[in-house]
Amino acid sequence: MPLSLTLRLQLNLEQITALYNFGQFQYTYGNYSGAADYLYHFRVLSTDVDLNTSAHWGKLASDILTGKWDVALEELNTLRETLDARAGAAPAGAAAHTHAHAEPLATLHSRAWLVHWSLFVYFNHPAGRTLLLETFLAPAYLNTIQSAAPWVLRYLAVSAVLSRRAQTGGPTAPVSSRVRHAIREVVKVVQLEEYQYSDPVTKFLKELYVEFDFEAAQHQLQLAERVVGNDFFLSEFREEFLDNARYLISEAYCRIHQRIDIAYVVLCPTSRA
């Protein structure tokens, strides 16, 4: 318990707060490893909810900037759990009336920031794309994306395509139903949110799975190749994205045609796609 540990170490509130301030100072001049250490120890000792949340953000930023992706993922998960717990805690008495409108907006704002910051982790950690699907397809975060950050649908769509193999699951690599049905769920969202956001990546999925227009899907894939290749988070996944997208075209074509043009299927992964 932080209180018993504080008493045992004989630390007062001013000394504990100094850890936060010094961690903030370390971050300001670029010593991100030092900042992460000070903010971590501050969190262990502090009982100030708001400062602890701020320290979470600071440590996550520090872990991202030092490229410690396993540590950053752990911090991201901890921060998400903290935000979700605060969102689920209903205030009582007069506070419930006063903050009835402010709390949902603050929660939306915090989750929107988390969604954006998480892109650094999810597109650098080896298991990041599957973990992105787990988080972004959860109702609370999908609602956040739809309400405050529809452009994040690009990253959701790319992750669904990149995680094609993971969606098949298996005895050695079981996956959740959320990941297993990711493409189907993403297509629904893409179709629903088309009025406020679309790009060649989302259009590719729509043409392939909603319109069943394979020529249009291939055209959008050509455009998506440029979009993915120029995107800060996605550029290194360009070839993997194309390979998986071409497979999805062939798979969809074979599913809906009783007679299959073998030349089409064979050529699709190379020249035609």
Which ranges hold each PLM region?
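Extended alpha-helical scaffold regions
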Residues: 1-273
